[in-house]
């Protein structure tokens, strides 16, 4: 049963005025009476629309600098009144039914994100009347349509035209869900903001704020259901943040191929975040969340050729990320050479897409160009809890490194050291990366002892016939013993970059000096678990 309800009277009060004039014009043209408040009412009147100010409708003026506008029985009675049940009381108090409420809320998130935002500014951008109307209309969705997203305007008009000016219960219910999601997210932002403020729970502390709120409220929107999770017996879905400010797998557009799997998304994220570290044309190949080949080159084709050489065996069925547009020549090289699950790049040429289309199972994603990294939070679920930390956006430049050995690195060793240090940040701990001439030549990932990661990196290089002599090695954390340096020297490494900080640093440095290895300390660790 559709349970249509005609829309005869609508109340419009929005902070984000995108599309509101056109929507109001469409409603008015269909005979809908318009009520409005403040700036929205002035805008509609300026556009020549017949609009009644809420203060005129209620007979009660806006007051307290706009803090009190819609908190009135004639407004909320009109929204909450149940058709066929509350008609008599509404008539007794001259309350007219309001069939549609169009509201979006004060821009609290944008306000508190501004540099120098004061507590007073934040407080004045806490909407009171808006959420109250939204919740009232959503509660009474049986009779009232609540609209909180401008993206719904066109669909609402189309449905009204198809139903003689009415909306169905199914649509009103769907709009109500969006409304409750909207107010929940809004209240969560406010709670998170106040929860991280002094003196909310820091007692007499003079610190400006705590980094993390007392109660962490998170809101994510389901982007897609998945066939299954990490394994076929696990159900899964992909949720994304509403306003992501950085190019990411969450915001990427899939332009080709079958649906992404759970593991595809996780691996694509790892590949994309790694390739973002490089300014030069770069390619990152990932398998099971670990880079198995990374290189920079004169072009993305050159970078791909060099990245692939690191470990062609592991590259099979991998994820490939670029930081430049995917061109036809590179696409052809990939398709001719290997099986690939996903290719992600800022963009893809039409010619490249024609080539990859020949392989229906190849998923191609475009994510747009990216600017600087955006600070945010990383989460790790544990049974019964959630670990929260800042994103690891740390990186060192040449000027921040400390040479701790007798020998200084050559210019090429230094370039390779900085290159493999960027890669090591994205390799599972314990992470060891060998690099030479701006390409990885061996990667040791995820071993329980650092020396075995160093040995594996050397074995990988030897298996592919890659020359290790003269290469640089990066370690994501300090060496607890000299054995990792001995293993690297045996393979041919001549420069090591690592955080330092071990109680045996002197022994490790002495080992490097014995082997004639230049060693650089970053004073920054990049564990990845």
UniProtKB/Swiss-Prot annotation:
Q: Identify the pathway.
A: Purine metabolism; IMP biosynthesis via de novo pathway; 5-formamido-1-(5-phospho-D-ribosyl)imidazole-4-carboxamide from 5-amino-1-(5-phospho-D-ribosyl)imidazole-4-carboxamide (10-formyl THF route): step 1/1; Purine metabolism; IMP biosynthesis via de novo pathway; IMP from 5-formamido-1-(5-phospho-D-ribosyl)imidazole-4-carboxamide: step 1/1
- MGS-like domain location is 1-148
Q: Which GO terms describe its cellular component?
A: cytosol
Keyword list, A-Z: Acetylation, Hydrolase, Multifunctional enzyme, Purine biosynthesis, Transferase
Q: InterPro entries, per this entry?
A: AICAR_Tfase_dup_dom_sf (IPR024051), Cytidine_deaminase-like (IPR016193), MGS-like_dom (IPR011607), MGS-like_dom_sf (IPR036914), PurH-like (IPR002695)
Q: What is its EC number?
A: 2.1.2.3, 3.5.4.10
Gene3D superfamilies for the chain: 3.40.140.20, Methylglyoxal synthase-like domain (3.40.50.1380)
Q: Does the keyword Transferase apply?
A: yes
- N6-acetyllysine PTM positions: 287
Which Gene Ontology MF annotations are present? IMP cyclohydrolase activity; phosphoribosylaminoimidazolecarboxamide formyltransferase activity
Q: What SMART domains has UniProt attached to this entry?
A: AICARFT_IMPCHas, MGS
What is the superkingdom listed in this entry's lineage? Bacteria
> Which GO BP terms, alphabetically?
'de novo' IMP biosynthetic process
- One Pfam match, by short name? AICARFT_IMPCHas
Q: Does the keyword Hydrolase apply?
A: yes
Q: Which reaction does it catalyse?
A: (6R)-10-formyltetrahydrofolate + 5-amino-1-(5-phospho-beta-D-ribosyl)imidazole-4-carboxamide = 5-formamido-1-(5-phospho-D-ribosyl)imidazole-4-carboxamide + (6S)-5,6,7,8-tetrahydrofolate; IMP + H2O = 5-formamido-1-(5-phospho-D-ribosyl)imidazole-4-carboxamide
Classification via NCBIfam families:
PRK00881.1 (NF002049), purH (TIGR00355)
Task: Report the sequence similarity comment from the record.
Answer: Belongs to the PurH family.
Q: What is known of its domains?
A: The IMP cyclohydrolase activity resides in the N-terminal region.
Under which name does UniProt file this protein? Bifunctional purine biosynthesis protein PurH
Question: What gene does the UniProt entry assign to this protein?
Answer: purH
């Amino acid at each position: 049963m559709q349970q249509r309800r005609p829309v005869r009277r609508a109340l419009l009060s929005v902070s984000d005025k995108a599309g509101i004039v056109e929507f109001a014009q469409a409603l008015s043209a269909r005979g809908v009476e318009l009520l409005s408040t403040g700036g929205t009412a002035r805008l509609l009147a300026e556009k020549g629309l017949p609009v009644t100010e809420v203060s005129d409708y209620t007979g009660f003026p806006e007051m307290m600098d706009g803090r009190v506008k819609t908190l009135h029985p004639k407004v909320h009675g009109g929204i909450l009144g149940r058709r066929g049940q509350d008609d008599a009381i509404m008539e007794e108090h001259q309350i007219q039914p309001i069939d549609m409420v169009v509201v979006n809320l004060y821009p609290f998130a944008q306000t508190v994100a501004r540099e120098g935002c004061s507590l007073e500014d934040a407080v004045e951008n806490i909407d009171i009347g808006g959420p109250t109307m939204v919740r009232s209309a959503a509660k009474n969705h049986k009779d009232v349509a609540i609209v909180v997203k401008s993206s719904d305007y066109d669909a609402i008009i189309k449905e009204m035209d198809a139903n003689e000016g009415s909306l169905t219960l199914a649509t009103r219910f769907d709009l109500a869900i969006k409304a409750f999601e909207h107010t929940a997210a809004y209240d969560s932002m406010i709670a998170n903001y106040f929860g991280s403020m002094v003196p909310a729970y820091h007692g007499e502390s003079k610190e400006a704020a705590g980094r993390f709120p007392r109660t962490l409220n998170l809101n994510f929107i389901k982007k897609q259901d998945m066939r299954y999770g990490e394994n076929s017996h696990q159900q899964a879905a992909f949720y994304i943040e509403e306003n992501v400010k950085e190019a990411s797998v969450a915001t990427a557009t899939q332009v080709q191929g079958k649906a992404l799997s759970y593991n595809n998304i996780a691996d694509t994220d790892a590949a994309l975040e790694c390739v973002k570290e490089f300014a030069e044309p770069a390619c990152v190949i990932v398998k099971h969340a670990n880079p198995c080949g990374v290189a920079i080159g004169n072009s993305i084709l050159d970078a791909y050729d060099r990245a692939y050489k690191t470990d062609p065996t592991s590259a099979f069925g991998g994820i490939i990320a670029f930081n430049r547009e995917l061109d036809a020549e590179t696409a052809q090289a990939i398709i001719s050479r290997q099986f690939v699950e996903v290719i992600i790049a800022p963009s893809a040429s039409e010619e490249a897409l024609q080539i990859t289309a020949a392989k229906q199972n190849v998923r191609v994603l475009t994510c747009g160009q990216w600017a600087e990294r955006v600070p945010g939070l990383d989460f790790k679920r544990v049974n019964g809890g959630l670990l929260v930390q800042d994103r690891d956006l740390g990186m060192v430049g040449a000027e921040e490194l400390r040479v701790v050995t007798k020998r200084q690195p050559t210019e090429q060793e230094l370039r390779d050291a900085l290159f493999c240090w960027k890669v090591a940040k994205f390799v599972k701990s314990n992470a060891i990366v060998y690099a030479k001439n701006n390409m990885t030549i061996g990667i040791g990932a995820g071993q329980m002892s650092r020396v075995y990661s160093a040995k594996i990196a050397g074995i990988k290089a030897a298996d592919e016939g890659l020359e290790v002599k003269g290469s640089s090695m990066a370690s994501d954390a300090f060496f607890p013993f000299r054995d990792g340096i001995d293993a690297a020297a045996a393979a041919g490494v001549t420069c090591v970059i690592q955080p330092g900080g071990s109680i045996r640093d002197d022994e490790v440095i002495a080992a490097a000096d014995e082997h004639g290895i230049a060693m650089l300390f970053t004073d920054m660790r990049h564990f990845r678990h």
